[in-house]
Amino acid sequence: VAGEFSLGDLAVRFGLLLRGEPDLRVSRVATLSHADAGALSFLANPRYRKQMQATRATVVLVGPDHAADCPVAALIDPNPYLAYARIANLLHPQAPPDAGIHSTAVVAASAHIADSACVGPLAVIEDEAKIGERVFVGPGCIVQRGAHIGADSRLMARVNVCAGVRIGRRCILHAGAVVGADGFGFAPDAGTWVKVPQVGSVQIGDDVEIGANTTIDRGAIDDTVVRHGVKLDNQIQVGHNVTIGAHTAIAGCVGISGSTTIGERCMIGGGVGIAGHLTIADDVVVTGCSLVSASIRNAGSYSSGMPAVETRMWRRMVAHLRRLDGKER
């Protein structure tokens, strides 16, 4: 926690309209239902309005449409969730790593590690790897031969950055992420398979976040590319030679087949499957559990699949479909 901040200071610092006493102070964030004195909360979804009306927070970040319903001090902004994100980063800053290399880490003689970096217990840094300023390499991480980690990036426990991979500045790789494993490339040979060497690498831009147990395969020949500002949730599979455009956000359990290009500022919902060798335009939204089997050339929102219904209803629908099929025959 960074300390206490007055509401007046927060209003000036972040360009917010304050309704309430400017000398009131907050030191932490909390949900509307669990906040107490000294806590800041927010209302971004109207369904939680009743919780706001009963909150004990010192102040609530709220949009203009709901400010009148707030029983405590209000910091008013058209985008309260964005304002909350910025203030939460101020109140709960990421502590800088303690510089140094743990005694149990294994570091190759030819590796270059910045003096301000932190290498945790049982980490392995291989030949010619480069670890930038203020980088945190967590317990059990492996940074393979020739990989580069940009300044201020953080590798949580047991991240594997494979040979030759480039990670940009201010990136966060959560526990168990693997960047640069072999892509799924096999040539059929009379009922068997011959492995195709995966000789490309992976290029990760600046300010990228990669969720726990997400895997990004190295390119077959050219590199797999994740551009600046991309946000990847947990358990995503990114196939070889995929390109993900800047500031695209992808939710958990998405599978992206090889050689597909996703544009900038896209939002991909959880559980989406994307076939290979496709192009998805900038500013596309794909809703959860959809199947993308053809390229999407225009911005907009796209969906497929059927929402869950009661089992009885589902069985009736399937029965109707079967009868329709019988009529066609």
Task: Label each region the model flagged.
Residues V1-T104, V165, R170, G176-A177, ...:
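Terminal amphipathic alpha-helical/low-complexity segments used for targeting or macromolecular assembly
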Residues F42, G100-E310:
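Structural signal for interior beta-strand "rungs" in well-ordered beta-sheet cores
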